[in-house]
């Protein structure tokens, strides 16, 4: 488990706070489109018929694909026999998808099973002597809603010439709630540091990125989620949008929404060019972003996120070229209800063993972070959100799992060419700011 005692240099403190993005009132200036956090989907809200299974060593299922599938198919059959739902269970087929970078196997069940039946299949597999661990391949997601706001000016100690810096980016310089970024910039601006942003991907054409982007990779393996033509993983991490065209599309209670361009916002918060006379300032303007796409329509699967963690930190993932720019820091401004699962934890442990610091958002639900993932995972730095006056925001998750907190609102680039947006929430601020720590 990570040593929770941190030595915070001015730059480190600045980056940590900035990742959260300050959330308070804004200046009466040109209005920015603003996004504030809403609650994430509860654990199990989104149906998934995909299972992450780890088989015990020295069993046939550990090495033989047929044995892996037979174990799952047998569990499905037992569920059908015990519930009397023979028609739906009998029609369900287990399909082997792939081996994950952490060594577990991803197996997909056909959609004839209900969510309750999938839960029972998991219970059956946990009782199988050949199975070491099994859980549902949950979907995690960024959560934002749009809103207009106005507020008050800030008085920075050092004012870069980025035109929106002084009016909107209080989280960088406000003496009470800010991160004192100007003092940190005097010491370091992140040169030579690679930050992997595991998110919705990137829109690379914005002028304020100023060449701070590596190519990255798209790890989404479901065409319905990625909005690409196939399930194949591809280089580039291009954000195809995560809009939801109607209510209840992703789960009961989900609402229609436009694309968040969340990954572009987070990447800009970290590394958009500073003092270049364009837009806003980045907390670590000389760092380099490695965009890794794991979130799309309705979110992203845990299995894809786990593989992305392995790859971003320099580990090996079958079918994906080696990462020639392993990240010093991984940022995950994403999450969902439920405690940390074993697949995510194993992936994080591997990343830390390779020398990568993993920073995650605590969550925007106003709840104990222990009940959210990856906020509750060990070997991470979990970051909550504070207000302009330094107190915790109304929406920030809290509790013993939260290691650090920083301004919960930040302006950055958005999905429109040359555009900017203000987002409130630790998700867009916490991780980017922590990278500078």
Predicted regions mapped to residue ranges:
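Subtilisin-like peptidase catalytic core
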Residues: 182, 193, 200-201, 212-343, ...
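Protease zymogen maturation seam
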Residues: 31, 99-102, 126-194, 202, ...
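Extracellular S/T/G-rich loop segment that most often corresponds to the catalytic His/Ser-adjacent loop
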Residues: 222, 233, 356, 372-437
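Loop/turn elements at helix/coil->beta-strand transitions in domains of secreted/extracellular proteins
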Residues: 129-133, 191-195, 286-290, 325-330, ...
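Primarily auto-inhibitory N-terminal propeptides
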Residues: 15, 26-166, 185
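Gram-negative bacterial Sec-dependent N-terminal signal peptides
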Residues: 2-26
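Catalytic-core regions built around general acid/base machinery
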Residues: 340-358
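Active-site glycine-centered loops adjacent to acidic/histidine catalytic or metal-binding residues
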Residues: 199, 363
């Amino acid at each position: 488990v990570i040593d929770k005692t941190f030595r915070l240099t001015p730059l480190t403190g600045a980056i940590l706070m900035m990742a959260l993005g300050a959330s308070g009132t804004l200046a009466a200036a040109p209005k920015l489109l603003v996004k504030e956090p809403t609650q994430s989907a509860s654990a199990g809200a989104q149906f998934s018929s995909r299972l992450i299974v780890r088989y015990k060593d020295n069993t046939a299922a550990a090495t033989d694909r047929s044995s892996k599938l037979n174990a799952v198919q047998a569990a499905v059959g037992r569920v059908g026999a015990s519930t009397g739902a023979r028609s739906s269970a009998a029609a369900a087929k287990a399909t082997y998808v792939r081996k994950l970078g952490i060594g577990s196997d991803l197996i997909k069940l056909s959609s004839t099973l209900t969510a309750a039946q999938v839960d029972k299949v998991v219970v059956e597999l946990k009782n199988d002597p050949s199975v070491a661990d099994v859980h549902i391949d949950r979907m995690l997601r960024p959560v934002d809603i749009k809103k207009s706001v106005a507020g008050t000016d800030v008085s920075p100690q050092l004012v870069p010439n980025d035109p929106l810096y002084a009016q909107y980016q209080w989280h960088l310089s406000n003496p009470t709630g800010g991160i004192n970024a100007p003092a940190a910039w005097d010491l370091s601006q992140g040169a030579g540091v690679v930050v992997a942003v595991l998110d919705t991907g990137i829109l690379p054409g914005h002028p304020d990125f100023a060449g701070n982007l590596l190519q990255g990779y798209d790890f989404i393996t479901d065409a319905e989620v990625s909005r690409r033509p196939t399930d194949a993983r591809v280089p580039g991490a291009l954000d195809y949008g995560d809009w939801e065209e109607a209510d209840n599309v992703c789960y009961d209670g989900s609402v229609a929404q436009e694309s968040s361009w969340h990954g572009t916002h987070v990447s800009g918060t970290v590394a958009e060019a500073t003092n270049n006379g364009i837009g806003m300032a980045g907390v670590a303007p000389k760092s380099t972003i490695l965009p890794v796409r794991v979130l799309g329509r309705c979110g992203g699967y845990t299995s894809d996120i786990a593989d992305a963690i392995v790859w971003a930190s320099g580990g090996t993932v079958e079918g994906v070229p080696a990462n020639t720019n392993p990240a010093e820091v991984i940022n995950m401004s994403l999450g969902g209800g439920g405690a940390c699962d074993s697949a995510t934890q194993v992936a994080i442990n591997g990343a830390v063993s390779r020398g990568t610091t993993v920073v995650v958002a605590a969550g925007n639900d106003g709840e104990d972070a222990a009940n959210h993932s990856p906020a509750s995972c060990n070997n991470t730095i979990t970051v909550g959100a504070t207000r302009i006056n330094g107190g915790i925001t109304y929406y920030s998750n809290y509790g013993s799992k939260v290691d650090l907190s920083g301004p919960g609102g930040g302006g950055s680039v958005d999905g429109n060419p040359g555009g900017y947006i203000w987002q409130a929430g630790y998700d867009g601020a916490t991780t980017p700011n922590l990278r500078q720590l």
